[in-house]
Amino acid sequence: MRRNKPKKQNHKEKKKSLPIRLNILFLAAFVIFTWIIVELGIKQIVQGDDYKNQANKQEQSEVSSAVPRGKIYDRNFNAIVTNKALNAITYTRSKSTTQEQRLKIAKKLSDMIKVDTKKVTERDKKDYWILTRPKEAKKLISSKERQQVEDKKISDDDLYQLQLKRITDKQLNELTDKDMQILAIKRQMDSGYALTPQYIKNEDVSAKEMAVVSEHLDELPGVDVTSDWEREYPYKNLLRSVLGSVSSSNEGLPSNLLDHYLSLGYSRNDRVGKSYLEYQYESLLQGQKAKVENITDSKGNVTGTKTVSEGKAGKDLVLTIDIDLQKSVEKIIEKKLKAAKARPSTELLDRAFVVMMDPRNGEVLTMAGKQIKRENGAYKFDDYALGAMTSSYAMGSAVKGATVLTGLQTGAINLNTVFKDEPLYIGQDKRGKKSWQNLGPVGIQTALEKSSNVFMFKTAIAVGKGEYKPHQALPLDTSAFDTFRNYFSQFGLGVKTGIDLPNEMTGYKGTSRLSGFLLDFAIGQYDTYTPLELAQYVSTIANGGYRMKPQLVKEVRDSNAKKGIGAVVDSVQPEVLNKVDMKSSYIEEVQAGFRRVATKGTAAGQLASASYKPAAKTGTAQSFYDGPDKSKTGTDTYNTTLVAYAPADNPEIAISVVVPWTYIDYNQRYSITNEIGREVMDKYFELKSKQDKEGTQQKNKDKIEENAENTTSSDN
C-alpha cells in the first residue's frame, strides 16, 4: 500500500500543472493574435494605399508633350515663319501591349485611314509576314534547329534571323495593298517608347478620317485624335536658307546633332532646329514642354493622368531684316543677273550677293544671295543668301580703304603723300604692275577716286620697308603680311564677323610671302573675303572706326495667343567688337576719298545723281573660276565688287555688292555691281519713306493683335 502513495502524489501534481500550461498557451495565443491584429491595422490603415498600389502594381511615369514653336517676324512685324496646325492621329502604347494587340488595332485603323507606305522597309515586311503567318513561318525552321534552341546552342534571336533570311521574294509578294496599309500603321505604333504618343498620321489627315476615328476611339485603345504643326513660310523661299529648318515628327533629333541635343535633356523624338536661325535660337523657339504624369495599372494600362506642369509656347523672334527690302533686293539681283547673262563673256557668271547693315548698331537689314542656272531653256534662281557668309572671293579695289589706313597708321605714308602712278617693273617682269591707266601724281583721295593700283603698290612697298628700282628685285620685310592682316582684321577682313548664325566661314589666306604677293594683297587680289566681311569693313569706315557685330535678331518676345504680340523679353544691344587702332583724321581722309568715288570717280556714272549722298569704293579683281562647273576650274576671270554707305555725312546704311566671275574678257567689262548698288540704296530710302509715312510697323502690330482677338473669340 505504501508503494502506491507516490503515484497518487505525482498524479495530483500533473493535474495542478495542466491549467498553468493552458493559461500560458492561451496567453501566448492572445499575444500573437493581438500582434497580428495590430499589424493588420497598421498595414490597412497606415500603409494601406502603399500596399494597395503594390498589389495592383501601379506605376507613375512622367511624359512630356510638345508646345507651339515660337514665330519669327521681320523688323516691321511681318510674320515670316509661323506654325500651321495639322490634324493628327496618334497612338500611345502601354508597357504590356503585345504585338498581336497592336496588330489588331492597326487592322481596325486601316479601315478608317489611308497612310503613306513609302517608308516601309523590306525588314518591316518580313517581320509582318512572320507575325501574320505563324504556321508558314514555323515551317522555315527545322526540328533540328528548334532542338538546338532547347539545348541552348543557339538563341531564339538566332532562330528568328534564320526565319527572316529564308523568306523569299515570292512570299513577300503575297502582301496585298491592305497588308501594306496595316503594316505602315503598325510600324508607326511600334516606334518610340511606351506611354509616349507616336504620330500614326499627321499629314493630309482629312476631316472625314478625324471624324471616323473619333467615333471609334473606344474600340482603339491607345489611339487619339489630336493636332500637330509644321513650319509655314508666308514669303515662300525668301531668305529660307538663312531661316534654317526644323526636324519632322518622324525624324526627331537629327543624327548629326543627336549627342548635342541629348546632352541638353531633349528626347529622341523631339522636333528641333536643324540649321541656321532655327538652330541658333533653338533654346528660345522650343518653349517649355507640358509634363503629364501617367498612372498605369498592373497590366501597364493608363488608368489616370495628372498634369505636373503646364507647357509654355516658344519665344518669338523679331529679326533686324526688313522682309520687304529683302524681297526687293532679291528681285533686283535676279533682274541684273538675267540681263548680264545676255551679254558676251559671261558664261561663268552664276551668282551675286548683297549685304546691307546699319553701321550704327550692326543690324543686318538684308542679306541676299542668288544663283542663276539655265534649265529647259529658261533661267531659274535659287536662294544663296548663306553664301554671303560661307563663300569667299578676291574683292579687288574695294579693300583699298584698308590699305590706305594701314599705310597711314604704320607711318609708311601720311596725309600729304603723293605717288606717281606709273607702271612698276619688278625683276624680269616686262608686263609691269600698273593701274587701269597711267594716272600721274596722285594723293590719297585721288588714288581712291580713280582706283590707283600703283598708289597701293607703293604704299605696300613702304610698309614692307622696301625700295623700288625698275627691273630689279624687290626685297621686302615679309612681316608686312602680318602687319596688313592685323589692320585689315580690325575692319573685319579675314576674320569672322561674329554674326549670330552657326557655320560662318572666313576666306583664304595666301601662304606664299613673295614680294609680288604683298602688292597683290594691297589691291585685294591675294586673300579672299566673304560678302559679309566686306559689309562689316565698309560699315566700320562709315561709322568712324567701330567694328560692329552683325545681328540678325533684334528682339525676343513672349508668345501671346490672346494679344498676338507678346512683351519684350530681351532686346539685343549693339555690340562693338573693337575700335580700330587708327586716328580719326585718317579715317576721315578715306571717307572723303570714298565720297569722291561716288561723285566723280569710278562709281559716279551710277551714284553721282543720288539725292541721299552716298560714298563708295568699286572693285575689280583678276581671279580664277572655282565654281560648280569643274571642267572650267582655274579659268581666268574677273570678280566685280562695290562697297558703299549713305548718307555720307551721317550713314544709316552700309552695303557690299559682290558678283564673282562677272566676265572673262576685260574688254567686255561693265558696271553690274554699281547698278545693283544704286537700285538697292534707292529702294531702301524709298521704302523707309513709305514705311515712316504709313506707320508700317504699328499697322502690322495692330493687324496681328486683331487677328489674335478674332481667333480667340472663335475658339470660345
Curated annotation (Swiss-Prot):
Q: Where is the composition biased (Basic and acidic residues)?
A: 689-706
> Phenotype when inactivated?
No visible phenotype during vegetative growth rate in rich media, no difference in sporulation or initial spore germination. Spores have a significant delay in outgrowth, between 60-90 minutes cells swell rather than elongate, upon eventual elongation they have a larger diameter and are often bent. Single deletions have reduced peptidoglycan (PG) synthesis and turnover rates. Double ponA-pbpA deletions spores have greatly decreased viability, PG synthesis and elongate poorly; increased levels of Mg(2+) increase spore viability.
The UniProt entry's GO CC annotations, sorted and at most eight, read:
plasma membrane
Please give the biological process terms from Gene Ontology that the record holds. cell wall organization; peptidoglycan biosynthetic process; proteolysis; regulation of cell shape; response to antibiotic
Q: How does it sit in the membrane?
A: Single-pass membrane protein
Q: Where is this region: Disordered?
A: 689-716
Please state the pathway this protein functions in, per its UniProt record: Cell wall biogenesis; peptidoglycan biosynthesis
**The UniProt record lists the keyword rRNA-binding:** no
Task: Provide the transmembrane region boundaries.
Answer: 22-42
Q: Report the main location listed first in the record.
A: membrane
What GO molecular function annotation could you give as one example from this UniProt entry?
serine-type D-Ala-D-Ala carboxypeptidase activity
The alphabetized UniProt keywords are: Antibiotic resistance, Carboxypeptidase, Cell membrane, Cell shape, Cell wall biogenesis/degradation, Hydrolase, Membrane, Peptidoglycan synthesis, Protease, Transmembrane, Transmembrane helix
Q: Where in the cell is it found?
A: Cell membrane; Forespore inner membrane
Q: What Pfam families does the entry give?
A: PBP_dimer, Transpeptidase
Under Enzyme Commission nomenclature, its number is 3.4.16.4
Q: What induces it?
A: Transcribed during vegetative phase, drops off during sporulation, rises again 30-40 minutes after germination. A small amount is present in dormant spores.
Reaction(s) catalysed (UniProt annotation):
Preferential cleavage: (Ac)2-L-Lys-D-Ala-|-D-Ala. Also transpeptidation of peptidyl-alanyl moieties that are N-acyl substituents of D-alanine
Residue numbers annotated as active site: S397
* Family that this chain belongs to: Belongs to the transpeptidase family.
Q: What does this protein do?
A: Involved in the synthesis of peptidoglycan associated with cell wall elongation, especially following spore germination. Has a partially redundant function with PBP 1 (ponA) or PBP 4 (pbpD) during spore outgrowth. Plays a redundant role with PbpH in determining the rod shape of the cell during vegetative growth and spore outgrowth.
Know the name of this protein? Penicillin-binding protein 2A
